[in-house]
Amino acid sequence: MFTLPGYDAFLGFLLISAAVPALALVTNKLISPKSQPGERELTYESGMEPIGGAWIQFNIRYYMFALVFVIFDVETVFLYPWAVAFHKLGLLAFIEALIFISILIVALAYAWRKGALEWS
C-alpha cells in the first residue's frame, strides 16, 4: 500500500471530519419523529391562510445583477487589504493590483456590452 510519511495526522483528521457529519445525519434520520405530510408542507404566512402557491418564477435579470454585484463585492474585499498596506508593498504589488483591476474592468465592459446591466 502506498503511504506518505508524515500524513497520518492529516488522514486521521480527514476521516474524522467526514465521519462526524455523516454520523450526525444518520443519527438524525434514525431518531427523528416521522411525520405525515399535511400542515408541515404549508407555507407560513404570518398566521394567515396561505393564498396561492409558494413557487414563484423570478426574472433571470435578478440573477445577472446579483452575479455582477458579487463579483465586484469580492473585488472590494480583495482590494481593501491592498489599499491598507499600499505603502509597505511596493511597486510589484501596485502592478499586480492594476492587472487585477484591469481584468475586472474588461469583465464589466463585457457584461455591459452583452446587456447584463440593462433592465428591459
Curated annotation (Swiss-Prot):
Keywords: Membrane, NAD, NADP, Plastoquinone, Quinone, Thylakoid, Translocase, Transmembrane, Transmembrane helix, Transport. It catalyses: a plastoquinone + NADH + (n+1) H(+)(in) = a plastoquinol + NAD(+) + n H(+)(out); a plastoquinone + NADPH + (n+1) H(+)(in) = a plastoquinol + NADP(+) + n H(+)(out). It comes from the Bacteria. Pfam families: Oxidored_q4. It is found in: Cellular thylakoid membrane. The chain crosses the membrane at residues 6-26, 64-84, 89-109. Belongs to the complex I subunit 3 family. This is NAD(P)H-quinone oxidoreductase subunit 3. It comes from Prochlorococcus marinus (strain SARG / CCMP1375 / SS120). The lineage of its organism: Bacteria, Bacillati, Cyanobacteriota, Cyanophyceae, Synechococcales.
